[in-house]
C-alpha cells in the first residue's frame, strides 16, 4: 500500500445523525479555511467533487424518530449518495477524502471503500466508540452507531450498503474516553484493539500509533481507512464540535499522530467529521482540521 497523489474531496454536509444544527456547514468551513490550496501546495493532484445533495432540514421533523432512530430516512438518502461518490473515486484510483458532516456519514463512505478491499482495516480516531445499536442507544442518534453498522449490526437499510463488513479485529480505536455500556461490552466481546486516553497518557501518542501500525500490518490488511472525528481532540483547544468530552488529545499530539500515519503509507482513505462552525470560535476548529490534513498528506516545516 502506498499513499496516492491523486485526491478526491467529497463533501457530505449531513446534520441528521445528531441533534445540533451547524455540522452540515462543516465541509464549507473546512474549504473556507484553505484546504484545497493547502493540499495543492504539496504538489498533489486535488479535485474537489463538491458536496453530495442532501435533504433539506425540516425543523419540525428534525428530532422525530423512526424505528427509534432520528432522521432515519434522511440518513439513508445521504449515505446511499455518498456511497456512490466514494465508490467512483476508488474505481478511478483516487484517494477519497470525505468531509462531514456528522459521523453517520461513515456508513456510506466506509461501506463503499470496503467493497474494493478484501481485508480493510479501520482506525477510528474519536472520543467515542460509535458502536451503539438502536436497542441500546441512549439517544437514538445514528452518529453514535456507524462503526457497529459497518461490522454488520444495525438497521437493515443501512446494512444493505455494506456488502463487505469490517472485521472487529481489523479495527483500532484511538482516543476513547466516553463509551456507553453496550459499547464497552462489544469491545470486550470482540477484543477490539482500543487505546483509551489513559493508555495514551501511559504510552505516549508515538507508541500508540506505532502499535496501531504494527497491529494492522499483522492483520494483513490490504487498505486502511482513517476516520477522524475532531471531538477526539480536547474541546478546550478544539471547541467547534457537538459532542465535547474533556480530557482529549492535544492538537500537537494529533499532528504527530498524523505525521506518523503519513510516514506509514498505510492509509488508503479518510473521513474528517463533526466540525461545527456554528459553535466554533472564528473557524478555529476548521483551521486546525486543515492543518491536520496537511500534515497527514506530508506537509512539514522544513
UniProtKB/Swiss-Prot annotation:
Keyword line:
Arginine metabolism, Hydrolase, Manganese, Metal-binding
Q: Which residues bind Mn(2+) 1?
A: 103, 126, 130, 229
The record's PROSITE patterns line, in alphabetical order, gives: ARGINASE_1, ARGINASE_2
Q: Does the keyword Hydrolase apply?
A: yes
Reaction(s) the record says it catalyses: L-arginine + H2O = urea + L-ornithine
Tell me the residue numbers annotated for binding Mn(2+) 2: 126, 128, 229, 231
Q: Name one GO molecular function term.
A: arginase activity
Q: What pathway is this protein a component of?
A: Nitrogen metabolism; urea cycle; L-ornithine and urea from L-arginine: step 1/1
Instruction: Name the residues that bind substrate.
Output: 128-132, 139-141, 180, 243, 274
| Co-factor remark | Binds 2 manganese ions per subunit.
Which BP terms from GO are recorded? arginine catabolic process to ornithine; urea cycle
- Record's GO cellular component terms: cytoplasm
Where in the sequence is the signal peptide annotated? none
CC cofactor? Mn(2+)
Q: What class of enzyme is it?
A: hydrolase
**Entries under Pfam families matching the protein:** Arginase
The EC designation for this entry is 3.5.3.1
**UniProt xrefs under Gene3D superfamilies:** Ureohydrolase domain
Which family does the UniProt entry place this protein in?
Belongs to the arginase family.
In Swiss-Prot or TrEMBL terms, this protein is called Arginase
